[in-house]
């Protein structure tokens, strides 16, 4: 749970842009009993798999990792056609990925997500299955599962 001081600091950013909006969710740990066997992952990594369940009134979002900086307007990215797509993202170069036949990867830290289609086709349920099965074995990271 975020401390009140941190929530206040984040909320104060609203004065930089009148169009910005901050919503804070207290998230239950839906990953109880999940053992992470990779040094470069935390349970927070897996919350992108349930974001559609947390934000039910929004159909499309831009997902950015917390360590991602943006400069400029993201409207053009947000307005990309997502009619039949779950995700749009930036291609990531991964020539030596083990244990997979996936040949095209997207960067899981910067994505446009069609939450409406994802919810309709229950894609997040499938993601959770993959996360629990593969990522818990230390084989796949978030890049593979999203790709």
What are these regions (language model features)?
Residues 1-147:
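Glycosyltransferase catalytic domains, chiefly GT-A lineage
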